[in-house]
Amino acid sequence: MPSKVFVAIDQRDIRHSVVAFASRLAAETSTVVRVFHGIEFVGRGCAAPLESRDEAELVVEEAVFHLRMAGVGAAGLVRPCLHRDVSRMIVDEANRWGADTIVVGGRQGRGPGRVLGHGIRERVLRRSALTVKVAPPEHVSAARIRRTG
């Protein structure tokens, strides 16, 4: 069982299923969790953030709160990054912290980028030597998650 789980979340609703999955993963052991959220900047030159620092910190604080309420030791981390560097930052921060496992969302993206493996989840899976667990989408039943978890 992992003792340090690095959980990467974004601002979309999928973060709730990622946090719930990480909570179940950590609940039965003395696992600690670090929740990571990157403030993504898009564009060229003077890139614009997709959200404010306050919005990003609120996303992380909410996730940490839910983990702590479930009895899981948790802390959060927010870092600015360019959209194309998010996967590298996830892997680098997880390694820097000494994580055993990285948890990412399982939401299916759209378009050719997902099919060709250009999504953040796919790039984390390719880049990391750590165990990477993909949280199932919210519509998957809790019983199935427990069986496969």
Feature-to-residue mapping (PLM):
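Intrinsically disordered or low-complexity boundary/linker segments at protein termini
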Residues: M1-S17, R126-G149
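Charged docking surfaces used in two-component/phosphorelay signaling
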Residues: R79-M89
